[in-house]
């Protein structure tokens, strides 16, 4: 199992949202690049970076993302507002290792399924769960498509992974909703990254014992609920 520390960015600053609500955010003093360097120096092998401005359709932080990619040597999983094939290719060409797509993957399933293997192998399909439905467009909309329908489609292609977020718990420090995550795990043999609500090391232990591949941790680090050094010990 691996821990992916999260860096969420709005207006060039590190933030954490509560339940995916843009107006309910906490801004932190460290710059995204400083946090990325901290995680690299601590020994993590992957960081999860989200451009929330792009997610919400309010501009982007491309310069910040590019700076992080240039100065950080470890793997970077990038997410946020990546809603076209060209945008995916641009991120790959910049050197990002895994590209997380949600809205585009849900709204344009057939297009994504037809990508060449070399491209689709770089993709993590985001499944943002909100009120038992899949959310899109910065968690502002939900789709009537079932989780099973979407997962069945992508199970037939060599995607990198699924990225599952429990939006209701995200930023709440309320603990992982293992019932939701385990229900998805039953639908696929692909790698799964989970996140949303990690509050302590018990959540990490629970994730490992349930066989999840990666866990994203954000607010629990920023709020000093879990030490960086203790998290690194869980990396495979």
Show the residue positions of the predicted features.
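Catalytic cores of alpha/beta
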Residues: 76-98, 179-214
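Short, acidic/polar
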Residues: 28-40, 84-89, 142-153
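Conserved anion-binding
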Residues: 12, 18-23, 89, 96-170
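N-terminal active-site wall of soluble small-molecule enzyme domains
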Residues: 41, 48-94, 178-182
């Amino acid at each position: 199992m691996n821990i992916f520390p999260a860096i969420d960015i709005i207006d060039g600053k590190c933030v954490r949202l509560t339940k995916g609500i843009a107006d309910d955010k906490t801004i932190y003093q460290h710059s995204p690049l400083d946090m990325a360097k901290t995680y690299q120096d601590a020994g993590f092998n992957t960081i999860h970076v989200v451009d929330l401005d792009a997610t919400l359709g309010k501009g982007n932080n491309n310069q910040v993302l590019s700076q992080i990619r240039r100065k950080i040597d470890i793997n970077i999983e990038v997410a946020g507002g990546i809603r076209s094939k060209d945008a995916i290719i641009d991120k790959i060409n910049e050197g990002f290792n895994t590209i997380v797509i949600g809205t585009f993957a849900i709204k344009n399933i057939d297009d994504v399924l037809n990508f060449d293997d070399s491209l689709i192998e770089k993709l993590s399909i985001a499944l943002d769960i909100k009120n038992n439905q899949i959310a899109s467009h910065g968690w502002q909309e939900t789709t009537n498509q079932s989780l099973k329908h979407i997962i069945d489609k992508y199970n037939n292609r060599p995607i990198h992974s699924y990225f599952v977020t429990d939006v209701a718990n995200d930023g709440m420090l309320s603990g992982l909703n293992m019932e939701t995550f385990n229900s998805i795990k039953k639908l696929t043999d692909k790698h799964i990254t989970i996140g949303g609500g990690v509050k302590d090391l018990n959540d990490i232990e629970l994730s490992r014992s349930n066989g999840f591949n990666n866990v994203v941790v954000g607010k629990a680090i920023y709020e000093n609920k879990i030490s960086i050094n203790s998290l690194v010990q869980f990396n495979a």
